[in-house]
């Protein structure tokens, strides 16, 4: 380890001890060192012994900084790894940190643009509008049009900080995986790999810009969701420029009600937006926490969601969507056998899994949930319980479904915060049934045929040549087969002839031996000579 890594490790250990997180460590030889450090570093005391363990964990991650805050946020979605009281606290982590110097932000923007900021913008506000662990946001106006915009800039020198902490995380995960057998099923190294990929992706604002443009295209002209326009010609890897929007934060219930917002419709539209993204577009905003969602105040009776920060998105293929739709429909029809069989057929649990045992395990977990009124059932928790049960049957983690489950929990939470009587099933069921109807039956066949029509239209002029070539090749193949068959028949005839001559020759040789013992020498000689002749003829027939 380098001196800087040792220093950072000491800082992490100090924070861990100050918040009493050594209580989280299992009783194992590897974990005795941190526990002994509690005695060795006697001057470091547990500052909050009266606080619950989950709260102490959250506060410790906040103190350790952006890498650990985001790691805690990601881990809050992995309820298969953490008990509820810890996962609930991790979900409260807020990605809000002190802003860095505005002049430094301006210098970083000018470095990305390749010239003074005044060449492109006016009214630049050096005081940030918002600040997070990875980036900071300032306001300005476009010089040519006077249009209000926001500039999102990556924090300078954030990458080395992230890479250093990630290296330490890898070291810790490798040690845990190597020395604690019961932790191996949690795959700590894979968890860190997944986290590193997510975090590094957020450092490239071109990716976020691309995601925002895609989501904006998908909802162009929609009354349900608005995504701010990205000004692409002045955006780059470390700078993203987009239009400025004015809205009410979705968690500000008091202001929404004061504005006369139709809360029921707003809540239902949140669910509708989510399922539209999933089943129509196969592309969904996967970070829809309250800080990234606003409400357009202009038409409160017909409220529109506004989605920001598209750094994290999820994509689903046809199989993923079928899995989600059929499982949810199976649940609400209490067809747990179908749910179990779907997992086996998809290959997500081993083919040798006992379907009856799997069905029974799902039924035990889900029956209490579906005993509630439909309006009280949480889709997100249904999926969570399903994933946890399936993992006991060796289901591999599906990252895209974990993202989807996290987003669904966000959407449900927001929806019921806005309108507690929200019936998600009533809103979601039409999406599921419509999508399934499009996948099965005559309509699905005609749709598939229509989709393939341009391809076949392009290939149609080649069809006569293809038919001619196929017929010609078929004729040549038939001729070859006839020759092969004729050769085969000739070979079989030769084999039969050779076998006959061999048998006759063997019989004559045996007769010659008998005649010789009876002193009939002349006849024995003739029989032997004839037998040898037949053998020679059989050998020739076999050639």
From Swiss-Prot:
It is a single-pass membrane protein. Signal peptide: none annotated. It comes from Aliivibrio salmonicida (strain LFI1238). This is Probable protein kinase UbiB. Residues 123-501 form the Protein kinase domain. Is probably a protein kinase regulator of UbiI activity which is involved in aerobic coenzyme Q (ubiquinone) biosynthesis. Keywords: ATP-binding, Cell inner membrane, Cell membrane, Kinase, Membrane, Nucleotide-binding, Transferase, Transmembrane, Transmembrane helix, Ubiquinone biosynthesis. The active site is at residue 287. The gene is ubiB. It comes from the Bacteria. It is an enzyme of class 2 (transferase). Pfam families: ABC1 (PF03109). Belongs to the ABC1 family. UbiB subfamily. Its main location: membrane.
